[in-house]
């Protein structure tokens, strides 16, 4: 009597791919993005984390974050990018928002002078609440509108950044221009500063600098590679 067997033969089974385990995240970098309302902070996050731009984006309410995973010397690093509302009524979340941040982007709109004039206040608040070693980058968004609509000359921003010892970049969340470069530069500098501090403490016989309990390896710019985005692309408009 013939019997029907369910499943596949052992010969066929050996060709079936087994489910892969999720890759282990080695490090987590918290980066905060601050600036006036409507300068494009949320759009910068969407462009960097999902390569998206939402035309009907609404103002952020409270605090939210998005992530993107990158590879540094074979280690997986999750960049956790925090976004907050620029309105004054949400400033009560300040302390918790800045806690643990290794880097920050202070964003202004190059077509709105007032948003740039407020940058000094944002930097002051950041330095009052964040760690002294946090890496800060001044970011002029909406560079795609520079012809005919620019209200903040690049020279003004460069001068302010130099005076305040900030990194500087002009980007376009709409076109994606220079967005990845700005974030990667910030993340590389975070690594550099943490490593330098760690080595200095070790040479003095002190405790090592730790990031989420993990060892930090020295990297060069060529070691920074983008990995596949681990999260599903979704517009958070």
UniProtKB/Swiss-Prot annotation:
Record GO biological process? cell wall biogenesis; protein transport
Q: Give its localization.
A: Endosome membrane; Golgi apparatus, trans-Golgi network membrane
Tell me where on the tree of life, at the top rank, the source sits.
Answer: Eukaryota
Q: Which residues carry this modification: Cysteine methyl ester?
A: 237
User: Does the keyword section mention Cell cycle?
Assistant: no
One Pfam family hit: Ras
Q: Where is this motif: Effector region?
A: 57-65
Q: List the disulfide bonds.
A: none
Can you list the GO cellular component terms from the UniProt entry? cell plate; endosome; endosome membrane; extracellular region; Golgi apparatus; nucleus
Q: How does it sit in the membrane?
A: Lipid-anchor
Drop me one GO molecular function for this one: GTPase activity
What is the first-listed, main subcellular location in coarse terms? membrane
Instruction: Report residues binding GTP.
Output: 35-42, 83-87, 141-144, 172-173
User: By its UniProt entry, which InterPro entries does this protein fall under?
Assistant: P-loop_NTPase, Rab_GTPases_membrane_traffic, Small_GTP-bd, Small_GTPase
Can you locate the S-geranylgeranyl cysteine lipid attachment residues? 235, 237
PROSITE patterns in UniProt: RAB
**Record key words, sorted:** Endosome, Golgi apparatus, GTP-binding, Lipoprotein, Membrane, Methylation, Nucleotide-binding, Prenylation, Protein transport, Transport
Q: Which tissues is this chain's protein expressed in?
A: Expressed in root tips.
Entry annotated with the keyword Flavoprotein? no
Q: What does this protein do?
A: Intracellular vesicle trafficking and protein transport.
Say which family it is in: Belongs to the small GTPase superfamily. Rab family.
PANTHER family documented for this protein: DRAB11-RELATED
This chain belongs to the protein called Ras-related protein RABA3
Q: Which organism is it from?
A: Arabidopsis thaliana (Mouse-ear cress)
């Amino acid at each position: 009597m013939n019997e029907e067997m369910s499943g596949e033969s052992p010969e066929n089974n050996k060709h079936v791919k087994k489910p892969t385990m999720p890759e282990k995240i080695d490090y987590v970098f918290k980066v905060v993005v601050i600036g006036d309302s409507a300068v494009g902070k949320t759009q910068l996050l969407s462009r960097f984390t999902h390569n998206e731009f939402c035309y009907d984006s609404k103002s952020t309410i409270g605090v939210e974050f998005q992530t993107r995973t990158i590879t540094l010397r074979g280690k997986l690093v999750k960049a956790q990018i925090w976004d907050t509302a620029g309105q004054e009524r949400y400033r009560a979340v300040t302390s918790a928002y800045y806690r643990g941040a290794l880097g920050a982007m202070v964003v202004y709109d190059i077509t709105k002078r007032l948003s740039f004039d407020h940058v000094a206040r944002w930097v002051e608040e950041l330095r009052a609440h964040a760690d002294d070693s946090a890496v800060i980058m001044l970011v002029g968004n909406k560079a795609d509108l520079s012809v005919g609509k620019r209200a903040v000359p690049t020279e003004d921003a460069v001068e302010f950044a130099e005076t305040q010892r900030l990194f500087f970049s002009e980007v376009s969340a709409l076109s994606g221009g220079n967005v990845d470069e700005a974030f990667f530069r910030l993340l590389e500098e975070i690594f550099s500063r943490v490593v330098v501090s760690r080595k200095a403490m070790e040479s003095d016989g002190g405790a090592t600098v730790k990031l989420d309990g993990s060892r930090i390896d020295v990297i060069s710019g060529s070691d920074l590679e983008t990995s596949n985005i681990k999260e599903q692309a979704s517009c958070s408009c």
